[in-house]
Amino acid sequence: MGVAPVSNQPLVAQQPKGIIDPSTGKPIGSNDPFFGEINNELADKGFLVTSTDELINWARTGSLMWMTFGLACCAVEMMQLSMPRYDVERFGFAPRASPRQSDVMIVAGTLTNKMAPALRKVYDQMPEPRYVISMGSCANGGGYYHYSYSVVRGCDRIVPIDIYVPGCPPTAEALLYGVLLLQKKIRRTGTIER
């Protein structure tokens, strides 16, 4: 009645292969060392073992909330990042309107002496850990207005900067690359390399 013959060989479950992408049949992220390590651990044990710090850093890199601090023309390129062509939210990088809800501040444009205290105040309102991306030549070092009496020669004189994105104005691709570098930097937080 459809019963398999009894054999003396023990029944062994199939070796788990990790997380399989249904469209390709290969493990997800097979060319990425980070995902390769996760897939190897899943294939070996069937579950993941991690420390709380690693879990928190993993969650932090995938759920960064950014706040715009658009001061000049670079802000237009920064806005492009949220549009459908680049869709930065697919990397877990979502915009927020309040500094109290954001982890990352993107300073885009020329920082004047009158605006510097406001920048510092907004930075101080952000919860720890907080990160700053300096976008464009003006934010990085004064840019075209470097010798002006009313311009701060780089926002790193006011707040600590984690990632510098060069350009006048930098493209949305350059800013997206800066976001990915920031996520990479957050992954290694807690090591000497920070």
From Swiss-Prot:
Q: What is this protein called?
A: NADH-quinone oxidoreductase subunit B
Question: Which EC number(s) are documented for this chain?
Answer: 7.1.1.-
Q: Which GO terms describe its biological process?
A: aerobic respiration; electron transport coupled proton transport
Signal sequence annotation? none
Subcellular location(s) of the protein: Cell inner membrane
GO CC annotation, single: respiratory chain complex I
Q: What keywords appear on the UniProt entry?
A: 4Fe-4S, Cell inner membrane, Cell membrane, Iron, Iron-sulfur, Membrane, Metal-binding, NAD, Quinone, Translocase, Transport, Ubiquinone
Which metal ions or organic cofactors does this protein require, according to UniProt? [4Fe-4S] cluster
Give the family, as the similarity comment puts it: Belongs to the complex I 20 kDa subunit family.
Q: Which reaction does it catalyse?
A: a quinone + NADH + 5 H(+)(in) = a quinol + NAD(+) + 4 H(+)(out)
* SUPFAM superfamilies to which the protein is assigned, alphabetical: HydA/Nqo6-like
Q: Which GO terms describe its molecular function?
A: 4 iron, 4 sulfur cluster binding; iron ion binding; NADH dehydrogenase (ubiquinone) activity; NADH:ubiquinone reductase (non-electrogenic) activity; quinone binding
Which purpose does this protein serve, as stated in its record? NDH-1 shuttles electrons from NADH, via FMN and iron-sulfur (Fe-S) centers, to quinones in the respiratory chain. The immediate electron acceptor for the enzyme in this species is believed to be ubiquinone. Couples the redox reaction to proton translocation (for every two electrons transferred, four hydrogen ions are translocated across the cytoplasmic membrane), and thus conserves the redox energy in a proton gradient.
Task: Spell out the Pfam families in the cross-references.
Answer: Oxidored_q6
> What is the native source organism of this protein?
Rhizobium johnstonii (strain DSM 114642 / LMG 32736 / 3841)
Oligomeric state and partners? NDH-1 is composed of 14 different subunits. Subunits NuoB, C, D, E, F, and G constitute the peripheral sector of the complex.
Q: How does it sit in the membrane?
A: Peripheral membrane protein
Q: Which residues bind [4Fe-4S] cluster?
A: 73-74, 138, 168
Enzyme class, broadest EC rank: translocase
- Copy out the cofactor comment: Binds 1 [4Fe-4S] cluster.
